[in-house]
Regions:
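C-terminal "cap" of GNAT-fold acetyltransferases
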Residues: 133-170
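Conserved active-site alpha-helix within GNAT-family acetyltransferase domains
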Residues: 114-136
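Conserved beta-strand in the GNAT
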Residues: 53, 59-67, 74-79
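Active-site rim helix/loop that mediates acceptor-substrate recognition in acyltransferases
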Residues: 30-53
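Conserved acetyl-CoA-binding loop-helix of GNAT-fold acetyltransferases
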Residues: 80, 86-99, 121, 125
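Short amphipathic alpha-helix that is part of the acyltransferase structural core
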Residues: 1-36
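Conserved GNAT acetyl-CoA-binding A-motif
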Residues: 101-114
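Alpha-helical elements of Rossmann-like donor-binding domains used by nucleotide-donor carbohydrate transfer enzymes
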Residues: 18, 22, 40, 92-96
C-alpha cells in the first residue's frame, strides 16, 4: 500500500539518498550542472524539511523536492522509479502532497517536459479530482535543455463571496 512520508534525518535519510542517486541520470538530462541543482534545490530542501518520500509496502519508490513561497507550492523535482511510474502512484503522490499542504498553499506549480503527454494529462486529472483550476504556461528560458511548460494547479476562487460570508440576509 502506498504512503507518503516527510524526509527526516536518521529516520529515512538513507532511503532518500538511495532514490536520489537513482534519479541522477534523469536530473543530468534536465539540468546541465547537477552541482548547481544540488546547491539551489536539493540541499535547501533537505535543510528546510521540504522533501516528501513515496513508499510502496515500506520500499522507497519516489520523492519530490518542493518549496512554498507566497502560498505557492513549487515542485523543483519530482521522481518516481521507472518500474512504479504509473497513474496509481503518481496521482496518489500528488494528491497526498496537496492534501497535506492545502492549508498552507493556494496553488501548485511544476515544470513538465512538453512532450511528456502522460505527465501533462496526469496533472490535469489531479486538478480535476481535487476540483482545482489547471493552467499551462510555456517556458521561454534558454537554460532549460528541453522545452517545458509550467503547470499551475490552483484553488478555484469562491463565487458569490459576499453571499457565503453575509449571514444578515436570512
Amino acid at each position: 500500500m502506498p504512503s507518503v512520508q516527510n524526509y527526516k534525518t536518521f529516520v529515512n535519510s538513507l532511503d532518500f539518498e538511495k532514490i536520489y542517486k537513482e534519479s541522477l541520470p534523469i536530473l543530468n538530462k534536465l539540468y546541465p550542472n547537477i552541482s548547481d541543482f544540488y546547491k539551489k534545490y536539493t540541499y535547501p530542501c533537505i535543510n528546510n524539511g521540504t522533501v516528501k518520500l513515496l513508499y510502496n509496502d515500506q520500499k522507497i519508490i519516489g520523492y519530490v523536492l518542493y518549496s512554498i513561497k507566497k502560498r505557492i507550492l513549487k515542485f523543483h523535482f519530482y521522481y518516481i522509479t521507472p518500474k512504479n511510474r504509473n497513474r496509481i502512484y503518481g496521482r496518489f503522490f500528488r494528491e497526498q502532497i496537496f492534501e497535506q499542504l492545502k492549508n498552507n498553499v493556494d496553488s501548485l506549480e511544476t515544470s513538465i517536459n512538453k512532450t511528456n503527454f502522460a505527465a501533462l494529462n496526469a496533472a490535469r486529472k489531479t486538478a480535476e479530482k481535487l476540483e482545482l483550476d489547471f493552467l499551462l504556461k510555456k517556458i521561454e528560458n534558454p537554460q532549460y535543455i528541453c522545452k517545458q511548460y509550467v503547470c499551475e494547479i490552483k484553488k478555484k476562487p469562491l463565487d458569490n463571496l459576499e453571499d457565503v460570508c453575509d449571514s444578515s440576509r436570512e
